[in-house]
Curated annotation (Swiss-Prot):
GO MF annotations, alphabetized: iron ion binding
Keywords for this protein: Iron
UniProt keyword annotation of Iron present: yes
Pfam families attached to this UniProt entry: Iron_traffic (PF04362)
Family classification: Belongs to the Fe(2+)-trafficking protein family.
Keyword Iron: yes
GO CC annotations on file: cytosol
Annotated protein name in UniProt: Probable Fe(2+)-trafficking protein
Biological process per Gene Ontology, one example term: cellular response to oxidative stress
SUPFAM superfamilies: YggX-like (SSF111148)
Species in which this protein is naturally found: Teredinibacter turnerae (strain ATCC 39867 / T7901)
Role summary: Could be a mediator in iron transactions between iron acquisition and iron-requiring processes, such as synthesis and/or repair of Fe-S clusters in biosynthetic enzymes.
Length: 88
């Protein structure tokens, strides 16, 4: 049986993640409030941000930026788009 959660991005019951996406309390929070679909969409958006903005994941500032953008993206707030990206 599929696990469901009330997704905070879409504000409805949706299929949940199979495992917490991050370790610790943050991972548990995401596991309980973010749908599988929303998380997959975030991973795609995160990849675009990393590539287009040439972020170095060894840099703590870049990681903090991605965490901030993740919160905005998953909460339905305004979030940064990848410069120069044109959706198909």
């Amino acid at each position: 049986m599929t696990r469901t959660v009330h997704c905070r991005k879409y504000n409805k019951e949706m299929e949940g993640l199979a495992v917490p996406p991050l370790p610790g309390a943050k991972g548990t929070e995401l596991f309980n409030s973010v749908s599988k679909q929303a998380w997959q969409e975030w991973l795609q958006h995160q990849t675009m941000l990393i590539n287009e903005k040439q972020l170095n994941l060894m840099d703590l500032t870049a990681r903090a930026y991605l965490t901030e953008q993740m919160e905005k993206f998953l909460s339905g707030a305004d979030y940064d788009q990848a410069d120069g990206y044109v959706p198909k």
